[in-house]
Amino acid sequence: MSARCCAGQLACCCGSAGCALCCGCCPKFRQSRSTRFMYLFYFTLVIIPCCVMMSPSVMKQMTEHIPFFEDFCKGIKAGDTCENLVGYSAVYRVCFGMACFFFVFCVLTFKVNNSKSCRASIHNGFWFFKLLLLGAMCSGAFFIPDQETFLNVWRYVGAVGSFFFICIQLLLIVEFAHKWNKNWTAGTVRNKLWYASLSLALIMYSIAVGGLALMAVFYTQWDDCMDNKILLGVHGGLCVLISLAAISPCVQNRQPHSGLLQPGLISCYVTYLTFSALTSKPEKVVKDEHGKNVTICVPDFGQDFRRDESMVTWLGTLLLVVCISYSCLTSTTRSSSDALQRRYGAPELEVARCCFCFGPDGEDTEEQQNVKEGPRVIYDEKKGTVYSYSYFHFVLLLASLYVMMTLTSWFHYENATIETFFVGSWSIFWVKMASCWMCVLLYLWTLVAPLCCPSRQFSV
């Protein structure tokens, strides 16, 4: 590693320089992207010990196989076997520290418009000191007095924050559906893109119908599972309702771009949430004619799959981290932030393209051609920020609360462990059901709002 690269990495950790990879074969990194990835890396660093804290089996293995583990636990006054660092209360405290960390930066970076200011330098650099600050905040949360009051209050704060995090994701899904359809419709006259749009709509409807049909086969029985039957019937009816509403003459009159692509995407998402809710539902056990306990309303292979708890748990936890990280990245782009504030680009500026959602964060700069050695960073925010710094930290704050509530099984926290993460609970079931219904209502509102308020200008 060259001296210039070492100096660059030191400037990244202890100064305001951007972080990137040094080797010549590695791609160049925009500062706007590398900063977000670093914060997500810190976010993941906190989630990992939270998962360990919710796993009694992992803590037992650590006690048995790590030398001087008990001495270490006594040294930090965490109990003989670190029992004070295990369970939902420990996760609450660690996530409280992480939420405070992102709240501080949310306030600090409010109204930052370019990367030249002092506050922007703090946001984009000084990673070593920020890691120390994050560790200090998470550790300091364990010294909060009056544990019972703190946990009760923080639980409801976490529930409210998680609700807003879910709402942001649902709003962006609806916005993405409208933007996707509008973008592809812009090219139907010149490049026959409507063929692809129609084909994709048919594929998505096939997925939705097939998914509901498979759930009807595996999650219902002829003489039982009435609640699952009602649930599938209601959600199938909602998919039909939004599809008919999207192509109705009154909606088409106000929104000529409305078609089957948006409701097809929403129907697929409703189907996914329905499946996710059914898999999160507590098992229903009845006695058969021989007096044996039998689990019903779930597929047989699902019972076998759940028995391998370690594989299901850690794969599911990994998927949770990936999905939340992706949500934080996609919901903090400038276009997504503007969409949440009902600010959209002019329709005539839309260019039809298949991969519009993967556009660059910013234009290439001259520095892209000049970086030859050392950290390969492209400073793409000198003229203006690519994303809202404050909003990015706000989303990560909400994501911290969402992770906290998800890992501790929402309001069934007393007996929650990471090993029973996918066993199911009514709290998780109803959260996913509410998310599903809210998504449908949000999409319906985008269709009927121009009809209810004709004097107002709506654009999506």
Swiss-Prot record:
TM region positions: 37-57, 90-110, 125-145, 157-177, 198-218, 230-250, 259-279, 310-330, 391-411, 428-448
Positions glycosylated per UniProt: 113, 183
Protein localization: Cell membrane
Keywords, alphabetical: Antiviral defense, Cell membrane, Glycoprotein, Immunity, Innate immunity, Lipid biosynthesis, Lipid metabolism, Membrane, Phospholipid biosynthesis, Phospholipid metabolism, Transmembrane, Transmembrane helix
Membrane topology annotation: Multi-pass membrane protein
Tissue: Brain. Expressed at high levels in the white matter and the oligodendroglial cells of the brain. Expressed at low levels in the liver.
Origin: domain of life: Eukaryota
Any matching Pfam family: Serinc
Main location as per UniProt: membrane
MF terms (GO), sorted A to Z: acetyltransferase activator activity; phospholipid scramblase activity; protein-macromolecule adaptor activity
Reactions the enzyme catalyzes: a 1,2-diacyl-sn-glycero-3-phospho-L-serine(in) = a 1,2-diacyl-sn-glycero-3-phospho-L-serine(out); a 1,2-diacyl-sn-glycero-3-phosphocholine(in) = a 1,2-diacyl-sn-glycero-3-phosphocholine(out); a 1,2-diacyl-sn-glycero-3-phosphoethanolamine(in) = a 1,2-diacyl-sn-glycero-3-phosphoethanolamine(out)
Entry keyword Membrane: yes
Membrane-side (Cytoplasmic) residue stretches: 58-89, 146-156, 219-229, 280-309, 412-427
Record-level GO BP terms: antiviral innate immune response; myelination; phosphatidylserine metabolic process; phospholipid biosynthetic process; plasma membrane phospholipid scrambling; sphingolipid metabolic process
Cellular component GO terms, alphabetical: Golgi apparatus; membrane; myelin sheath; plasma membrane
Family: Belongs to the TDE1 family.
Name this polypeptide is given: Serine incorporator 5
The species this protein was found in: Rattus norvegicus
Gene name of the record: Serinc5
